[in-house]
A protein has these predicted regions:
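Conserved N-terminal segment of class I S-adenosyl-L-methionine
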Residues: 1-157, 166-172, 236-239, 260-276, ...
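Hydrophobic/aromatic residues located in beta-strands of well-ordered beta-sheets
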Residues: 115, 183-185
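Conserved, well-ordered alpha-helix/loop/beta-strand core segments that scaffold catalytic motifs
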Residues: 172, 185-186
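Feature marks short, surface-exposed loop/turn motifs that line or immediately flank catalytic pockets
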Residues: 180, 191-193, 241-243
């Protein structure tokens, strides 16, 4: 195994899972999930998302966000519907942590939620604010908790894989939630069975390991264990289209990135077809069952605070 002792004196140790770009990934016994060692300082990580994430790392993200809006809306509606079913109709306040351009806020506002967002990136926060949302342009720290106030739902979509201290994020989210409130988490579903198959057959490398952007690598189980360790009760799992299916059936977008846009278009068409048919429950059931099998591109969990 490998080990690293952080500035807080805690030792992260466990079996070495992989080494990519000179960075080790371990299955950490202390944390209960796979992460890189050494972990960067929280300040350095926060700085990256404040300044250059949307200009340098994802320069086309905001323009694609608009292009994908109708499709994203369908997926956000699915998530919000699940939350509404658990919460009941009177509880409709949410904060989206790392809200980016605010697409889930658009969906929530249209469904009658009172919503706000927190976003460290200036451009993305501005993009969301220009469309009428209440957005706090700051990283997630204890300093912003009072400003956000108590809510019924805290969502963090594709956030936890980026942060050096996911335990703190769950703890702060817990402080924002009323009793019975919900935590909605989405992270990449990494080292899943489809990915391992592609790698084992030599069709791809471990493309999902990106140690400079993704510090933490979760499965449905390790994500659920993380929330359980904070007293949350995992309620429901779901996922998104298993993109690896394309690579397993002759369209290897990993080895041939030029296939990527076409695959994305087709997965979008898949999700939208059920909408056009008035059968969106079929899509929801499909993704919930896939998640039960540990498959799908993302791991989404809705957990309840006692």
């Amino acid at each position: 195994g490998s080990a690293w002792t952080g500035p807080d004196g805690l030792t992260h140790a466990g079996p070495l899972i992989d080494t990519v770009d000179g960075v080790d990934l371990i299955s950490c016994e202390l944390c209960g999930f796979v992460h890189v060692i050494p972990l960067p300082e929280p300040e350095a990580a926060a700085e990256h998302y404040k300044s250059d994430y949307y200009t340098e790392t994802k320069p086309t993200y905001l323009s694609h966000a608009t292009e994908d809006a109708a499709w994203q809306r369908v997926l956000h509606n699915d998530l919000l519907l699940m939350a509404e079913t658990i919460l009941g109709s009177s509880q409709r306040t949410l904060v989206d942590i790392g809200c980016g351009p605010g697409l889930i806020l658009d969906a929530a506002a249209d469904r009658g939620w009172t919503c706000s967002g927190l976003e460290p990136s200036r451009q993305a926060a501005q993009f969301a604010a220009e469309r009428g949302h209440t957005v706090i342009n700051a990283p997630f720290t204890p300093d912003v908790l009072a400003e956000i106030g108590e809510v019924d739902l805290v969502s963090m979509i594709n956030v936890l894989e980026h942060v050096p201290h996911p335990f703190d994020f769950i703890d702060w989210a817990n402080q924002l939630l009323q009793p019975g409130g919900l935590l909605l988490l989405t992270v990449p579903n990494d080292f899943n069975g489809f990915q391992r198959t592609l790698r084992a057959t030599g069709a791809t490398d471990a493309w999902w390991i990106s140690p400079h952007h993704h510090l933490n690598y979760f499965s449905f189980e390790t994500l659920e264990n993380l929330v359980k360790s904070h007293g949350f009760e995992p309620f429901l799992r779901t996922t998104s289209y298993p993109m690896e299916l394309f690579a397993l059936t002759g369209r290897n977008y990993v080895a041939e990135p030029e296939q990527g846009r076409g695959c994305h278009k087709d997965r979008r068409a898949f999700d939208l077809a059920f909408e056009a048919a008035g059968l969106s429950h079929v899509r929801r059931t499909f993704y919930e069952r896939l998640a039960q099998a540990g498959l799908g591109r993302e791991a989404t969990n809705i957990a309840q605070k006692p």
